[in-house]
Amino acid sequence: MIKNALSRRSFVRLGLALPALVAAPSVVFAKTISRFSLSKTGHALDGYDTAAYFSAGAATNGADALTVTWKGAVWRFANEEDAALFQANPEAYAPQFGGYCTRAMSLKKEIPGDPEVWRIHDGKLYVFFASRGGTFFDKGPDEMIALAQSHWDTLTFVE
């Protein structure tokens, strides 16, 4: 009798603890990454001018002398006009998902994007690790963005 009572009591305790045990891995193992994919020199988007994708329609290297710091990252620009555009509305020009590859993000991975492989969709900039990511994006951008966003929302960021 005592043995059965202990077993039942243990079973009840396990049943009460199980939801906490199931939820714990998402808290304990949450990924922490830099909000922006930074180059070895600390520049966002590998030092490319993020406003130039919109103003010039091209991936353009920024100049060391023209920088803006936003959300802890240093952003380079090719000209003063692009720097001013970014300063006025950085969220309109910053790459989505912090400059990480959109395709990789949709697959729950964090891989830096290549600023030479990019798309603008619905007025937002998306970068990819390789041209294949852009090709997949072209086949279903909204679906890929939704998948990437759902993963992005689970991440925590080093500020």
Specify the residue positions occupied by each region the protein language model found:
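An anionic, turn-rich surface loop/hairpin at beta-sheet edges
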Residues: 96-118
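N-terminal secretory signal peptides
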Residues: 32-78, 83
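C-terminal segment of N-terminal export signals and the immediately downstream linker at the start
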Residues: 25-48, 110, 117, 159
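Hydrophobic core segments of beta-strands in well-ordered, beta-rich domains
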Residues: 76-77, 126-129
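N-terminal secretory/targeting leader peptides
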Residues: 54-66, 107, 114-117, 124, ...
